């Protein structure tokens, strides 16, 4: 069984899709970011950077020992699950390398650029949106 700490964000959606595609049993814990749920000590013990998403796997691979395992960051969670269930990740070295390149590109480039663009579109004062659109829109479209 997996506890899934989730907020309806692109990073949360990625992990939710992975859990569904693996047809796993999991319990969703909705984190109310506006209420500061991510800063509560119980959650910080799971995700020390106070970011979504995170999981606790109560039945980890034997190589992890007998205790439950927590994993935070969407890419780390997806890789952990892919490795555990031997699905959605190539096992040959070249295929795995290529999958890692695309995963790291998404979590380190495309995802953050989309997040910054969304921030400027949704929250920047109208007179400051042009810079955000030019900077992050251009990077996002380039990706």
Role assignments for model-derived ranges:
Residues 1-132:
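GST-like domain detector, emphasizing the conserved glutathione-binding G-site
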């Amino acid at each position: 069984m997996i506890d899934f700490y989730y907020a309806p964000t692109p990073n949360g959606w990625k992990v939710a899709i992975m859990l569904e595609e693996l047809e796993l049993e999991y319990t969703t814990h909705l984190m109310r970011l506006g209420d500061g749920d991510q800063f509560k000590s119980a959650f910080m013990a799971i995700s020390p950077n106070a970011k979504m998403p995170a999981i606790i796997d109560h039945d980890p691979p034997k190589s992890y020992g007998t205790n439950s395992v927590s994993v935070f960051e969407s890419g780390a969670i997806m890789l952990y699950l892919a490795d555990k269930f031997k699905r959605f990740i190539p096992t040959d070295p070249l295929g795995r390398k290529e999958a890692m390149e695309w995963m790291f590109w998404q979590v380190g480039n495309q995802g953050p650029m989309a997040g910054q663009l969304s921030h400027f579109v949704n929250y920047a004062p109208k007179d400051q949106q042009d810079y955000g659109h030019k900077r992050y829109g251009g990077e996002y479209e380039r990706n």
